[in-house]
Structures are given as C-alpha cells and as structure tokens.
Amino acid sequence: WVPEKQKAFYSGITDALREYIDARYGIDAMEMTTAEIFKDLKSSGVPADLYEEMKTLFETADFVKFAKASASDEENAAALPAAVRFVTVTYQSQLAEEEAARKAAESKSSAKKEGGEA
C-alpha cells in the first residue's frame, strides 16, 4: 500500500458510505463529522458489531485523511470488505422490514375483507 494513495482510498470508501447512510437512515452524513454520524447512527438499529466496525473504519480514515497517518496493511485490506458487509447487512435488513410491513398490510387488508363479508 502506497501511503500517498491511502487518502484517496479512504476518501472514496467513506464518501460512498456517507451517501449510503444518508439515503438509508436519513442522516446528513456528508455534512457531519465522524463523531456526529456515529452519535446519530447509534440509535438507528445497526447491529453493534457492524456499528463498531464502521466506527473503526471511519476513525482510521480520519487519521489517514487529516493527520497524515498511514494505516496498516491489515487495516487497508479490511476496509473495503467491511464497507461492503455494512451495506449488504443493513440493506438486507431494510428489505426484510419492508417485506414484513407488506405482509402485515396484506394480512390487515384480508382480515377486513373477511370481516366485512361475515
């Protein structure tokens, strides 16, 4: 990993995650600090392990981007898979929530129809 390329690498990952967090959770992440994002994200239902993994990723990115630090090879190798895991798991939970809401609405609708015909 070339240290000069780490800033662009982490900026790309965190910018994409900020956009996703905004779209998924309605948190204006593009205009917030890492601390502000994770303060708001804490109450959003993100599983604790994913929350901590993303918080670590964002904090590492902040050090690389703003403190001119270099991340370890292990941190670099783990960054993209962690971001993909976060999006995959939280998106799947969103789909499950939407499916449950759809089924509940269908059940309520069919119960009204059955009750109305009796």
Label each region the model flagged:
Residues W1-A118:
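Membrane-proximal, non-transmembrane interaction modules
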